[in-house]
């Protein structure tokens, strides 16, 4: 049983029925839900198209990998290595001992330049503007003029990453294509190039 209720877990722990054991696993939890869904991306099973690529890297067929956004771009850093464990059972199927043969290692931490507070402010402003013009699609990007760091990277409509984990088909079919990151994947006609030149000059003058 997956996502077993605490009552079932308590029963297995206390009564130890033959052949039953508890297995813990990690699960990705998303905070600031929807504020940067397309940018952060998702994790999932290896697709058929990517199976050979990940197999050559030593991934098992049932591995969970980044499938879009930062999760996919930084997969090689975020993905740890699996360990192996020897588990001994008695005749009744109960676990009598466990021993790590190789220790698992966790993936690295990565830090984006995104300012989540500014991202949320941009989300509210873009929502208001889209509502005013009767549209649901738009994008906003803000850079630090001194360093070039990306502070805001926003695409609308957005969606709940927590809901996506359990019902990605619905998210994919939603009107407005919320899985598309319009800030990075859209094609747009450039505006006035001279305005950029005068803006740069103004910034240099302070």
Give residue spans per PLM region.
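Conserved protein kinase catalytic core
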Residues: 47, 150, 161
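Small/polar-residue-rich segments within soluble enzyme cores
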Residues: 1-107
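Residue-level signal for well-ordered, solvent-exposed loop/turn and beta-edge residues enriched
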Residues: 94, 148-149
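A short, glycine/Asx- and small/polar-enriched loop/turn
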Residues: 33-34, 145-147
